[in-house]
Amino acid sequence: LDRLPYLSADTKTLQVSSFDRTGGDFDITTGNQNGSGGCLASGGVGCVIAEDRGAGEIDSIWFTRDNGNVTRMGAIRVDLDGHTVVDAPLQSLVDGGLGAPFVWPLVANAAQSPAGVYVKVPMPYRQSMRISVASNLQYYHVDYRQFSNVEGVRTFSPSDPALDVITTLRAAGTIDPKPPAPSAAHHNRGVELAAGATATIAESTGSGSISSLRLRLPNPADQALNRLRLRIEFDDRTTVDSPLGEFFGAGLGASDVRSLMFATIRQPDGSFSLSDWWPMPFARAARVSLVNATADPVGGIDADVVTVPDPQWAPALASGRVGYFTAYSHAGPTILGQDWLFADEQGHGKFVGVSHTIRGSRTKTSFSD
């Protein structure tokens, strides 16, 4: 995970899903079944939902029907390089019945992932992959990647339980998942922000990276999450500008959020701890600031920013082998019939995720799907 900033030019991410391939409107009498039950072809245990040739990796498989009860779909089979690596009842698979590595959080049933089930065990292949289910397919999507060559690719084997990975994932939101850095330096300070003011909470010079960022907000924290902004400059350019809540995954307000690379956690004293572990390299300098966009002073904030000096980052950034961490935020009403644009970036980079918040136009907490 400490190598996340490194960019690759030889991979492509694709998705197969249950959209209506005829371009028609949703038909309540048949559901979103593509006119053929969603199958791409017949094969495997019945209905092929994804297939690829060449080197690649299956990253995510998601289904729903019957409020997440997928028993009626029967078996799922995953064939990689001509060998079957999964052949089991789908419900048993997402319940964790096959054992590691097919256990939570790499698989989840509807109780663990509301209204849908998933399999997120990475399954690389060198020559081919095919995923099929027995019957009663409705809504699904399969995310996979294609590699330009087979160098370094080993076909997935379910005999490797990946217990170290599972331990790391189960600790998500509580610890930094990256390897420890012995040369890390902590920048600690208390923050008192006047109305409309900006405060620098950490600065660093030389080649290095921001390894983690922690903030503690006093209770009540909702206003601070919505109206305080986090800004980060790398090498004299601002690439992070976001409300605290959205950046730390709590855009709807003060509530617990646990993710692998960030977290918002209520503490026993009622305060909220915000943590971020994205690796953020810079060549010459970095500055982290908090901006108070409210008409009132905000105080009682504790900040701890960890930086790690490392000479590798300056030449890697200069050559384009590494990218700058970027997080922008924008908000506004949607327009009927028009797409909502999350990002429109140019050049070479790596997409790592979206934190988004939806509020209903009439009832703020009502937005359906």
Predicted regions and their residues:
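Beta-strand-centric surfaces of beta-sandwich/beta-rich domains
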Residues: 1-369
